[in-house]
Structures are given as structure tokens and as C-alpha cells.
Amino acid sequence: EYDHVATPAEAYQSEADLEKEFIRLLQEQGYEYLPIHTETDLISNLKAQLEKLNHYHFTDNEWEQFFNTCIANKNDDIVAKTAKIQEDYIQVLKRDTGESQNIYLIDKTNIHNNFVQVINQYVEERGAHDTKYDVSILVTGLPLVHVELKRRGVQLKEAFNQINRYQRDSFWAGCGLYEYVQVFVISNGTNTKYYSNTTRSNHLKEQELGGRNKSKKTSNSFEFSSFWADSNNKVITDLLDFTKTFFSKHTLLNILTRYCVFTSEKMLMVMRPYQIAATERIIQRINVANNYKLYGSIKGGGYIWHTTGSGKTLTSFKTAQLASRLPYIDKVLFVVDRKDLDYQTMKEYNRFEEGAANGQALIHI
């Protein structure tokens, strides 16, 4: 549970002041601030961070080859780059000696091996228009989270629309490193929301199709961005409180490495806070049951309640996926009490991960 932190006196706060305060809070939480404003410096830092994570020093030739083929491949779009973070985060480097070397883009096993940095006012001059981005979070040197701020009193949707303009005009520019962004955060100080990169990119695809069904809300529209909340589902809206919770390094790294689902339809889903809380509590109960040998007892079980349409299946899928990776778990059973739920669940599981559900393995009890 999170206790609200009182905000400063209600004096006028410019967007620049809000940005400065946000970065200060991130630094207090252990983020390293870097005065990076150009692509050259961004690439140089990326090389240094990957070398640090992988305990490996690239030769100039190796780095050029790895960067151009694995990181900034001109044939890769947002979907391909998302896959590299969510699924194919171990890339193979062909060393000058002819040997192969595994290079991690992100460490998903020991999340605090990842170096977290913050930059602001990054300049992109090679897009359709000259652009300055507000604040970006670098994880092992790659911009994986981007934050767009507006001063208090400005509608939050303006920040959402501005990110859409960036995607259209400049995220692809240069080496396209900003197409690695997985999660976007928008805030006007008073209200703060987050959403995945495919929410934004698919919104643009709809615009390109001529804006048919403009009144229809889809998963690509502003309405599908999410508020953050604590474990009791108390919504956290103010940027100050949001930063202390969502942007705590442990939480942010967990969201990026554990609580995203890259579906078979190539959509990136970022779980909602109550889904994350439910999943964590189930995994915690499983660990407790194992440590204290509570198998088969009431204390070794639990009950999670979600309302209709709130994403129960995604919660169960992610829980089953994470539980199956525990070293002492051999099998995860999923029990449904109606045939229509069985079909519906299999369909959803296969959407979250192709081949995750197999009807031939069903058992009638």
C-alpha cells in the first residue's frame, strides 16, 4: 500500500520545472543522469552499457557489425525491435576470432544487473521536423521508456498526441533507437498514465487507413492507456507519487522483464497494476508453500478475485508462465468448470503465446 506524498505549495509550475523535479526524484531513486542530447553520444553510451552488462569488450569491427546487424538493422521495424527486447534479447556476436559470443540486450534473470539511466531534451534533427524529446529512461543504454510531460492544467491527451507525432515524424530517424521504446508515460503533473508501444503504433496505422470508424474506441486509442495503482488498487495519479512507485527501479525493471506479454498477434500488452499485484501474490504464496512445506493445506493455497472483463485470463497466463519457471515446479494445472470457458481460455492463451494451449492435453475430471 502506498501513502500519498503531499505535493508542494500550489504555485505555478512550468513544464521545465516539472521535468527538473521529475529527474531529481529519479536520481534520488538511484537513476544515473546523463547529459546526452545526440545520437552519437547515445550510441557511445549504449556500447559502454552492453560491455558492462556482458563483461565483454567489443573491438571496433565487432561493434560496427553487431550494431548494424543486431541493434540498428534497417529492415527492423517497431515489432521486430520489440521482439528483441521481449523474446530475442540474447543476440549472437560473430567475434573477430570466428567464435560466437552471446550478447544480452537486457538481463531478465537478475534484473538489477541492468543499468538504469535518465536523459532529457534529446535532439533529433533528421526526422520530418527537428524534435526535442522530454525525458527518456535508458536500460542498458537502450531507450525503453519514454516520458512526455505537460505543465499542470494542460489536457493529458496533448502528451499522448505529441508522442503520436514523434512516431510519425522522428522516432524512426537516424539509427531508429527510439523504436525500442516499450512503454510510454504521459503526465501533466496532476494525472499520469502509461501504455505500450503498440498502443501508439497501431493508433498511427488506424490514422493511415483514413480514420474509418473514428468514434470507435480501440486498444490503440488514448482511452486504453492505464492509471497506476498500489497493491490495494488505490489509483496513483500525481507525477510525484507515480515516480516513487512505478519508477522505483525494482518495479520498472519487473514491468519490462516480467509483466509484459508480446502476443502472437505482435501486440505488446503491459499488465495493469491489479493484474501485477495478483500475479505477485500468487507467486509469493507458491514460494511460501514450498519453503514451509504447506503443500495440500489451506495455507498453501489462495483466492484471487477479478471482475468480469478485467483480464483474468491474462493474469492466469502470466502467473502460470512465471510459476512454470520456478526450479521446483514440474507442472502447472489450469482448471476450468465449463466447456465454453475451456475453449475461450485456450483461445486466449494461444493469443498470448502461440502453442501455449493444446486441446489434446485436456483432461476431464
What are the roles of these predicted feature ranges?
Residues 1-331, 340-356:
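ATP-dependent helicase/translocase motor core
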Residues 334:
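Conserved, well-structured core segments
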Residues 363-365:
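Conserved small/polar residues in nucleotide/adenosyl-binding loops
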Residues 337:
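Short beta->alpha hinge that forms the Motif I/post-I loop of the SAM-binding pocket
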